[in-house]
Amino acid sequence: MSQSTSAGGSQAVAQNPGAKLGFSMRSASIASDSVPCESGLCEAPPGVLSGAGTVFCESTYKVKIDNETVWQVPTRLKFVKKVGSGAYGCVASFEDTSASASEEGTEDDPSRREQSGETRTSQTGSAEGDSGTNKKVAVKKIGDLFRDLIDAKRIYREIKILKELKHENIINLVEILDPLTPDFEDIYLVSDLMDTDLHRVIYSRQPLTPEHHQYFLYQLLLGLSFLHQADIIHRDLKPSNILVNLNCDIKICDFGLARGLNMNPAPPPNLLPPATHRAGPAAAQDVVCTYTPPDNLSGAGKWGDQKLAAAAGAGSIAATRLVRLAHQQGSSLIGAQHQVPAKTDDASDDMELTDYVVTRWYRPPEILISPFCYSKPVDLWSVGCIFAELLGRRALFAGKDHFDQLRRIVRVLGRPSTAEINKVANEGRGRHFNNPSKGTSNTKRKRSEAARRFIESLPNSDPYKLEDLFPDASKAALDLLSNLLTFDPAKRITVQEALRHEYFEGLHSVEDEPTVTTPVNWSFDNFVPTKRLLQNKVYQEIISYHPEIVLRDFHLLPPRGIHVAPSSLPACIRQPLATLQQQMASLSTTARAVSRSSGSLPTVSRGAFLRTPLSGVNPPSGFFLGEDRSLSAASTAPPDEQSEGIDACGPMVRTASAPSVATSVANQLSVPGGFGAGLCSLKKESSSCGGGGGSARRPPNSGSHQVAAFSELPTAETSHSLPSAYAASLSPFPQAHAQPVSLRSNHVPFASPASQLGLSSSGGGSGGALVSAETLGASGTPAASSSPQVCSTAYSASYSAGFSASAASFASLSGVLTTSASSSAPFARKGELCRETTGQPVTTSDPLSARHTTSTSEAGAGEAVTAAPLSSRGRSELGVSPRVPVTQTAHPYIHKFLAHQRETSRRSSAIVCRATQHAAMPSASLRDRGSSGMFAETKVSLSDSRLPSVCGTVSGHSTSLPSTAAELLAAAQACGASGDGLASCHHASCSGQSCSLPSLGTVGVVSSSLLGLLPSGHPGDKDIEAGLAPDLAFFRGTSFGGRSTSCCVEGVSERSSGFLPNASLTPESSASMALVAALNSFPQTEGEARPGGPLTGHSAPARASHAASGTRCMRSGAETLGTGNGFFSAFGERAATAGPEGAGGSSAQESRTTTRSSVCTDDGAFFLGTPGESCQAQQLPGVTSASLLQQYQKELQQRQFAAHQAQTAQQQKRLQAGGIETVVVEPVQGAAASESNLVGVSRDISFNVGERTVENAMEIEESGRSEASVPQRVSYSLSEQQFLLLRQQQLQHGQQQL
């Protein structure tokens, strides 16, 4: 730090102590503090052309910090070297190439030139030897910021403090780099680059002279004085938190534990600047470092303190020097010094704070004895410990534990009197800093009493003489040290008194003591941390450094609860932002009007694609508009009942009243490559619902069901139907009564979850169809004599873009099974164009083997056709014909549970999928159930308890909610305990009609039991490979926005488990596809059916990635397999990547998949649905996926062990009786055996135990009683005790045979 002479300041030194005391190392230059722009100005980042309405989004690049770390930073930052790493993150030094450009831009402003020139000279001492004019900065990356919410809140607190505190002896937060999305996980903090810290200096071989001690301590006290004047206590002062530069400048850092003494009261009037000054750039929300002259000073004029500080930059050293210069030019400086504030015992100066502060060696006795209330003296004690460590080059009180620290303090300072001990021990008891009537806890009181008794038990010895401890120190230094290390905090010296101590004679100047004109408003710290809330708050702080990102992300901010005041933005940002908001409001109003005119529920549009760019603004190619109050952490307004419905048709309808509006919206929202066209349409008088949301829906007896032929497909332009991406975001439900049915085939290449969900595993094409159960009559009841026919439905290539974390989107899981054509998903899209066939044989195609198989319908199970994929123009490419992803009647099916958390404040959502099965049913049984009303359309209202609709779920009408895992398991068992028949959930439309929601390509779902063995093969299909029977699947993810989101998918079965960690989904991705990817990572063949087995078949990218990854992680006590980024390339660098270097540039060592993952949190609310008319969606706020999974694992092991004991006992009994070895074990659920209930059929189970390198397991070979059943080998995970007992029983069995 430099000191410049001024009139009346004779006590100031005339030379730079830093220049004289510099280390014997190369000098480093530090650029001046950045000057904030004036209101209305907006400077473009370097390399970006500025202009009215230009969106300044910097280009980034990836830089390799070390062998294991890759960062993504702006191109203006040039990597220099890695500085180090710590508990919170990694630090590296960069050169900011934009520093010289910003300095050149200050030539026209005298005040800014003054700051740039003088500050640069004073802080660097000398610029000689500097390689260039680029400013060197330190960039700190904090990865997985929200993994621990307490640590994340500390980092947020530090950001707020550093943003408002501007002082030359406090580390300067230059900026926070653009996170590129509001849903970020990592942040990059840019600060001044310092060469080392005081701890390394003390314990180095660098000689330290008394001048070094004096200069270091003086700067430390200056920075601490600024903090204490702002009523902030640091609470963690130690040498490692004091950064040192090569020219001996120091800066205090690490404000994560800092707290304000007066959190809520209004600031005193004498500290507030005039109102006319608070309106300027130095606004009231900033803490400004200024010099305050005496009141009787005249002639200040335009050189007023506030204006000088604002012109020179808040917190810069030039602010003080300009004030001095002003008084030199025309004012008589009166040498009156500031009066030292008198000590007060006011309760507002104290506060009850946590005792887990201050590193033990620097912890004052009042915290060791009475961790109730403490104040500013705690920092002065720490300064005294640091001063003693500087003098002696070792810690003075290096205690090993709590009591040893007290022992060392008493040994050096002497045992205090009983009165002093009782005073410190009783300080603050019975009062609280905000509530005087609030007392302290019994635990702290007991601890205080124990510490007091311990000190009294120590021998009463004389204190050490400081002259003996520090023989080279001066008397003034020892006197200051003695005043700092005073046992009684009330008698301890204050920071102002320390600065005026004789030890700093010749160095101290009153001008060096800046005053705080505006105290910090600590209201920002009064909140309970959650991930979404912390994300929003940190993002709002980033906006203050990069206001241009508001234009890029403005469509994502309202759903997340982020509200940016236009007045806080520069003029070049406010104007285009207002234009974008007007277009968004206009589009939302149009969607609402058209939606109401079509008879849909009144609702806020859940999403849209805006394709009309503004003049001078470059918005993203597509983004969502709308609102999602369920995930808004900051929004406290109650949800609008009128806006919580779900659009059934949305603005796709062409009505007579607003044809031009529909046409305009359709043209504006057209997506390149999309082809929203309603194929399954109904003849109505004034409207024609269509779009990618599915097929059209009609009331009973309103028209005939019409299936469009391939050549009759209209385009979006001619039918005025919006692209299906927009339709999906508004209406996830099918818009025609097209009931899917399970198909049977004699040839399916493999029985995988992809095929069960109606998806093709071919990466090159796509195909599929929704097939009606029977030819639907006017009433919606299946006709017995009609053969099944394909209901043609058009799906857009970007159909699944309309996802958001709400009930509307999660309810669409069964209807949205597509992904963008631009993504590299290994699975094909479902629901592409197909042609109507009646009475024709079923034709399937295997793209892998180029083999076609034709089969006829059996037992009325249904017929399928090959679905021809679409080109970008909506025409069929008949040359490429992938196989139809048919499902089989006896295969496991997924029972979808809705996830929504409107009534809770949870931030993520979950979809719980229940793997179920049912036996083959005759056509007559299907017709009987259809005639009984299972599939019939009925007119009901939302209040009708017989029809629990999605709308009712959103409105929170569900009752009798299970609250424990056991109740949830029981409810899941009761969900389909019959084991015979089909079920479906009904959902009501706005007009009171219902439509069966397709359950992922199957007619309905019937569960056997939660822990029942689920064979995946059909007794009549011998060629089918053994498939997977997943019992539970979890999908957790944050809000799907216009850019990307993060999610986790986990599936658990009796055979194995799969895990898709921290996947990054783009708007073109599908949540269903992610779920399929996780389930598809399970072993599929008989030889690989074990935990840890390699991925088989399906897709080359997934197979290659999983084979190279082999990553495992533990979640909820179950070992799962990381599939890496094998699903598709958009999974990003935080997924478990394949090999040493992942596709995203990151390594597997950098990836994290832990139980504390910020995305994989078990805070989603679960909805349980029961089949049939009792399909009641129930919210389970008290049940998490972790508890459900743990309960499942526990009961699974109990079931396995019970089955094994029963099998062993029967084997021994048969051996003793001379019978056969193969035994029949009844299932635990005790279901009766019948032809229609495959689950109830007894099984022949034989155990074969083998040693595993990864874990202990046993293999159970299942075979049905029928000769045509497919054997299945399943691996069961056992505990060590169970495995040893099983091994013992096996040995006993072998001995008996011998």
UniProtKB/Swiss-Prot annotation:
Gene3D superfamilies in alphabetical order: Phosphorylase Kinase, domain 1, Transferase(Phosphotransferase) domain 1
Uppermost EC category: transferase
Catalytic activity: L-seryl-[protein] + ATP = O-phospho-L-seryl-[protein] + ADP + H(+); L-threonyl-[protein] + ATP = O-phospho-L-threonyl-[protein] + ADP + H(+)
CDD domains: STKc_MAPK (cd07834)
Subcellular location per the Swiss-Prot or TrEMBL entry: Cytoplasm, Cytoskeleton, Microtubule organizing center, Centrosome
Binding site for ATP: V83, G84, S85, G86, A87, Y88, G89, C90, V91, K140
Record-annotated active site: D236 (proton acceptor)
Domain of life: Eukaryota
MF GO annotations: ATP binding; MAP kinase activity
EC number(s) stated in the UniProt entry for this protein: 2.7.11.24
Predominant location category: cytoplasm
Residue ranges of every copy of the Protein kinase domain listed in the record: 77-504
Means of activity regulation: Autokinase activity is inhibited by SB505124.
Keyword annotations from UniProtKB, A to Z: ATP-binding, Cell cycle, Cell division, Cytoplasm, Cytoskeleton, Glycoprotein, Kinase, Nucleotide-binding, Serine/threonine-protein kinase, Transferase
Residues glycosylated per entry: N67, N296, N521, N1062
InterPro entries reported in the protein's UniProt record: Kinase-like_dom_sf, MAP_kinase, MAP_kinase_CS, Prot_kinase_dom, Ser/Thr_kinase_AS
Protein family per UniProt: Belongs to the protein kinase superfamily. CMGC Ser/Thr protein kinase family. MAP kinase subfamily.
Miscellaneous note of the record: Mutations in the protein confer resistance to the bumped kinase inhibitor 1NM-PP1. Treatment of parasites with 1NM-PP1 causes cell cycle arrest after S phase and parasite cell enlargement. Mutations in the protein confer resistance to the SB505124 inhibitor.
Role of this protein: Probable serine/threonine-protein kinase. Plays a role in coordinated progression of cytokinesis. Restricts duplication of centrosome core structures to one per cycle and ensures proper formation and number of new daughter parasites.
Stored PANTHER family: MITOGEN-ACTIVATED PROTEIN KINASE
Name assigned to this protein: MAPK-like protein kinase
Name of the gene: MAPKL1
